[in-house]
Curated annotation (Swiss-Prot):
The modification Phosphoserine is found at residue 205. GO terms for molecular function: L-methionine:thioredoxin-disulfide S-oxidoreductase activity; peptide-methionine (S)-S-oxide reductase activity. Its main location: cytoplasm. The lineage of its organism: Eukaryota, Viridiplantae, Streptophyta, Embryophyta, Tracheophyta. The keyword Zinc-finger does not apply. It comes from Arabidopsis thaliana (Mouse-ear cress). This is Peptide methionine sulfoxide reductase A2. Gene3D superfamilies: Peptide methionine sulphoxide reductase MsrA.
């Protein structure tokens, strides 16, 4: 038989496997902000014996806290978040501008040494109450102007002081005056931030009646 008539063996051609398309890495979504009725509860914390609470929102809480620390009769200051929709928010949560919390300073003061009116006077002097959700270049609901009262007397004095302050200004005051709701203490590094040196490591004095200018970032 002619060898040319032999059945040809099939040739096997080796091929490289087709590259598998690589999916982009999955980025975990941030947890959604979940509204909680707990955030709407009243502030039921109790001040030290002989003291009363007062609470104010006047922009970034660092400089506002130091100003209140310097008032004779103020015994304790804390910075935190309130009047938002979520329970136990972090600073990062608040900065998303989705929780509606305000940055606040909660003050304990001895009414025998310091009047609520004194605290109100400082509040008005520390910020611009006519800019909605804004203080200077700081934008967002966390920087809004607010007075959060603990007693009917505080509410009365707050509203009277607003009327008095409005007469001095051409623009309309947008300060909210509302009952104090649940207070969420801010992270420890925010507490007495400027006294500890602030952003630049330059400690500022909390001494009573100190008149040194307050540098908002340290």
């Amino acid at each position: 038989m002619d060898s040319s008539l032999k059945t040809q063996e099939p040739q096997v051609v080796e091929t490289s496997p087709s590259p598998v398309a690589q999916e982009p890495p999955q980025v975990a979504d941030k947890p959604a902000i979940v509204p909680s009725p707990i955030a709407q509860e009243p502030d039921n914390d109790v001040p030290a014996p002989g003291n009363e609470f007062a609470e104010f929102a006047a922009g970034c809480f660092w400089g506002v806290e130091l100003a209140f620390q310097r008032i004779p009769g103020v015994t304790v200051t804390e910075v935190g978040y309130t009047h938002g929709i979520s329970h136990n928010p972090s600073y990062e949560d608040v900065c998303t501008n989705t929780t509606n919390h305000a940055e606040v300073v909660r003050v304990q003061y001895d009414p025998k040494e310091c009047t609520y009116e004194t605290l109100l006077d400082l509040f008005w002097s520390r910020h611009n109450p006519t800019t909605l959700n804004r203080q200077g270049e700081l934008l967002g609901a966390q920087y809004r102007s607010g007075i959060y009262f603990y007693t009917p007397e505080q509410e009365k004095l707050a509203r009277e002081s607003l009327e008095k302050e409005q007469k001095k200004l051409e623009d309309k005051i947008v300060t909210e005056i509302l009952p104090a709701k649940k207070f969420y203490k801010a992270e420890e590094y925010h507490q007495q931030y400027l006294v500890k040196g602030g952003m630049h490591g330059n400690a500022q004095s909390p001494a009573k009646s100190c008149k040194d200018p307050i540098r908002c970032y340290g």
